[in-house]
From Swiss-Prot:
Belongs to the lambda phage CIII protein family. This is Regulatory protein C3. It comes from the Viruses. Presence of the CIII protein in the cell results in the stabilization of the CII transcriptional activator (a very unstable protein), CII activates CI, the gene for repressor, and thus promotes the establishment of lysogeny. It comes from Salmonella phage P22. InterPro entries: Phage_lambda_CIII. The keyword Transport does not apply. The keyword Transcription applies. Keywords: Activator, Early protein, Transcription, Transcription regulation. The gene is C3.
Length: 52
């Protein structure tokens, strides 16, 4: 099965899922890194990472 997405080349379903998995893992890694940065701060954590 081939899927066409606006602004990108035609790709097979396996490539579409692979890129989605890459995006998900990249966002998870970035989130874990932000959490580690927050937990490694001395004193009271700042709210730079929080959308509060």
């Amino acid at each position: 099965m081939i899927i066409a997405i606006a602004g990108s080349a035609r790709m097979g379903v396996s490539q579409l899922h692979e890129s989605l998995l890459d995006r998900i893992t990249r966002k998870l890694r970035a989130g874990w890194k932000r959490l580690a940065d927050i937990l490694n701060q001395p004193g009271v954590p700042s709210h730079d990472y929080c959308a509060c």
